[in-house]
Amino acid sequence: MNQFKHTQLIKELALQHGFDFCGIAEAKELTEDAFRLEQWLAKGFHGDMHYMEKHFDLRINPKKLVPGAKSVITFLKNYSPEQEQPSGFPKIAKYAYGQDYHEVIKLALNQMLDDLRQKIGPIEGRGFVDSAPVLERSWAWLSGAGWIGKNGNLIQPKKGSYFFIASLIVDLECVYDQPIAKDYCGTCTKCIDACPTQAILPNKTIEANHCISYYTIELKKQQIETASDRSYQDWAFGCDICQDVCPWNRFSHPHQESKFKPIEGLLTMSKDAWLEMEEVSFKARFKQSPLLRSKLNGIKRNIEYLRSRGR
């Protein structure tokens, strides 16, 4: 089977396994991204996310993750919800409404790799879903999935940015897609203007240690310091402000993945309900949820902070 048939098969299987986009880029060292990442880390924009400092060489070179790698296959999976969270409740980022996307998408990637091996033969490859040293957005751009917006998110033309990004790095030669050369954000600055913590800097740079998502998910301290004393607008887990205001997301449409449907009662949980919840109940109710990343203590800390600010 030649590279043209490899490519056709990969894209057909991607649709069969529930992905909304599949693009392929040549596996190579990301020299420009390496410089940007180095500068971002040097400025301390990653805050306490010290894991970002590790495995630098792996992040910029897929051939060090999969020996003999020739192609990086990017997949997108829509998570735009049909049901919006009602106002008046602690806000949860849309990506966390349902089951943990890591588990859902990793299963699909493994099944896809199995199918490729059955149809082509032995393949050296690995799947990645936002939990390994892979620069997913860079590969998504290189594979023609979209462009990087001012808010740092990948934006698909006429579809928006509510997508999970996943990758397969394989030793197959394929026909490679071309990146979208134009930046369709133009002069729009809605995401920059709307960010209440001024976390979006020029040149598509995110100062993560000012971001609401960072403070509500990644920060492990028991107390949110006064240095971060800004308007959190009722966010208890993550933040969607810079995506919600993006004009391109008016083209988004509801996902078709049953596992991403909101966990029952999640979107209408009150502050009191969260604060009164016990650990056993939390683990049982959200055992397959991204909310486990913050742990119950983290979510309670966030809600107590909101209350202290009169929210």
Q: What is each model feature region?
A:
Residues M1-Y184, Q233-D234:
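Auxiliary alpha/beta "docking" domains used to position bulky ligands
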Residues Q16, E29, K190-Y214, L219-K220, ...:
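Iron-sulfur cluster-binding cysteine motifs and their immediate structural context
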Residues I155-I180, A208-A227, E279-K283:
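Short, charged low-complexity linear segments at domain edges
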Residues T187:
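SIR2/sirtuin NAD+-dependent deacylase catalytic core
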Residues I224-R311:
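Alpha-helical scaffold domains
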